[in-house]
Every structure is written in C-alpha cells, then in structure tokens.
Amino acid sequence: MTTLLLAMTTTLALAAPTEKPAIIVEGEQPPARITRAAVLTPTEGPPVVLYSAVNQTDQQLEQFTVMAFVFKADGTPRARQVAPGRRTLEPHETKYSTIVLDAGLVDPTDIIVIGIDGIQRAGSETWWHAELRPLAEKAVPVKKH
C-alpha cells in the first residue's frame, strides 16, 4: 500500500504544470482590471493563463474581453489572442477565469502579456476600450544581442 501511495504521489508531482507570471497591462481608467495572472504549462496541451479580474466600480459590469499576447524571448511578437472574460462582475467583485493559448506554438522562454481590452457596463450598449498592443510591446523586456 505504501508503494502504491508513493507511486501515485510521484506521478502527480511529475504531472504538475509549471507556473510563471504573465505581464499585466491596462488602459487608462479601466472599470475592471486584472490583478494577477499566471501562465500554467501542463505536460500535455497548450499553456493556460489563469487570471483574476476585479470590478473597480460601484456599477455592475455586464461583460469584458481579455487579450493575450505572446512574444519571443527577444521581444518579437509571436501571437495575439482574444477571449471573453467572465460575465457579470458585481461592484468590487473579483472573479477568476482562464484563457487557453492555442493560437500557435508557445515556447517555455516566451513572454506572455495580458490585459482587459473591452468592458461593457450593465444596461449600456457602450464599451470601454483599450488599445493594448502598444502597451504590451512596451512592457516586454527586450533582450539585446
């Protein structure tokens, strides 16, 4: 029994995903923001960014979209991906969600940048929007050759 337990524990430890922080960017005066983002790389399948988003307002937010950028270690853009975030963020509420980075190959040395690019308040057709690409490019540390 002890051998079986040890084998199962070892298997779980070896199958655990690796984790590294993602760089977070945001536009001016966002109604919601990402407060933490971690890139989880499983032994099989594409990396996943686990993030927390918090509503910074006293109003309900109907929906938001998240944009993730993948840069090579030298700062060269590799991919961009957009996904819907969680629906309905109550005032000052924090929710957790994920974005699967399956738009292309992601190397372990790649740099992941994430931010909220669009937010719609409840009862409104108007969206708050941020142009994240220049912010993402500026946030990536460029390695000099």
Stretches found by the model and what they are:
Residues 1-13:
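Bacterial N-terminal signal peptides
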Residues 18-52, 130-144:
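Low-complexity, acidic Ser/Thr/Pro/Gly-rich terminal tails and inter-domain linkers that flank the onset
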Residues 19-23, 102-145:
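Terminal connector regions
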Residues 53-57:
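Asparagine-centered strand-capping/turn motif at beta-strand->loop junctions
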Residues 59-63, 78:
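Short acidic/proline- and small/hydrophobic-mixed sequence motifs that coincide with surface turns
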Residues 65-68:
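Hydrophobic beta-strand segments
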Residues 70-80:
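Short aromatic-acidic-glycine turn motif
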Residues 78-107:
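Intrinsically disordered, low-complexity Pro/Gly/Ser/Thr-rich segments with frequent PxxP/GP/PP motifs
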